[in-house]
Each structure stands twice: as structure tokens, then as C-alpha cells.
Swiss-Prot record:
Protein name listed in UniProt: Dolichyl-diphosphooligosaccharide--protein glycosyltransferase subunit DAD1
Major subcellular site: endoplasmic reticulum
Lumenal membrane side: 54-56
Subcellular location field: Endoplasmic reticulum membrane
Transmembrane segments annotated in the record for this chain: 33-53, 57-77, 96-116
Assembly and oligomerization: Component of the oligosaccharyltransferase (OST) complex.
Membrane side Cytoplasmic: residue ranges: 1-32, 78-95
Gene Ontology CC annotations of this record: oligosaccharyltransferase complex
Topology class, membrane: Multi-pass membrane protein
Keywords of this entry: Apoptosis, Endoplasmic reticulum, Membrane, Transmembrane, Transmembrane helix
Record pathway: Protein modification; protein glycosylation
């Protein structure tokens, strides 16, 4: 009996999350897809390193750190662009995107410097 109530609770939770996410604006969903893509790319690189090896270790670290850093910056962009976030209400979306682009530029310059 406890399993069936736990299953019902889990199904209710997933249903409420799905219905809440359906109301999310499209621009936030696009940012979410970008974050998922960046994280999955990092995971693919880690699996590749585990299977094949990490001979140029600097290249492996640069690729993974680039993916993770880009995902973190995209999450920050999502927080700033979200209309329901009261902390960044005065920040225009164009400014948030410009910050995202500038921080990505700095991140990738550091990554390129790390490559040697």
C-alpha cells in the first residue's frame, strides 16, 4: 500500500512539474535546451575520455570546462531574463544577453590560453 501511495505522489509531482513547465515562456525553454546541450556535450567528452583515454589532457579539461562554464553562464542568463524573478526586474534582457556574451568571450579566451 505504501508503494502505491508513493507512486501516486510521484506521478502527481511529475504532472504538476510538467504543467508548470508548460507555462514557461519560450525564450526560457530555449535557454534550458542550450544548458541541456552543453551538459550532455560535457558528459559525452567524459565518457569518451573514459573509453579512449585522455592523452592530450589539457584539451580534455578545456573542452569539459568550456561546456560546464557555458552551462553555468546560461543558467545565470536564464535567472536574469526570467520575468518572475523580482531581483532582476530593472535589468533589461538586452543587458543580460550582453553580459552573457561578454562573459562567454572571457571564458573562452581563458580556455584558449589554457590550451597553450
Amino acid at each position: 500500500m505504501a508503494k502505491s501511495s508513493a507512486t501516486k505522489d510521484a506521478q502527481a509531482l511529475f504532472h504538476s512539474l510538467r504543467s508548470a513547465y508548460a507555462a514557461t515562456p519560450t525564450n526560457l525553454k530555449i535557454i534550458d535546451l542550450y544548458v541541456i546541450f552543453a551538459i550532455s556535450t560535457a558528459l559525452i567528452q567524459v565518457v569518451y575520455m573514459a573509453i579512449v583515454g585522455s592523452f592530450p589532457f589539457n584539451s580534455f579539461l578545456s573542452g569539459v570546462l568550456s561546456c560546464i562554464g557555458t552551462a553555468v553562464l546560461a543558467v545565470c542568463l536564464r535567472i536574469q531574463v526570467n520575468k518572475e524573478n523580482k531581483e532582476f526586474k530593472d535589468l533589461p534582457p538586452e543587458r543580460a544577453f550582453a553580459d552573457f556574451v561578454l562573459c562567454n568571450l572571457v571564458l573562452h579566451l581563458v580556455i584558449m590560453n589554457f590550451l597553450g
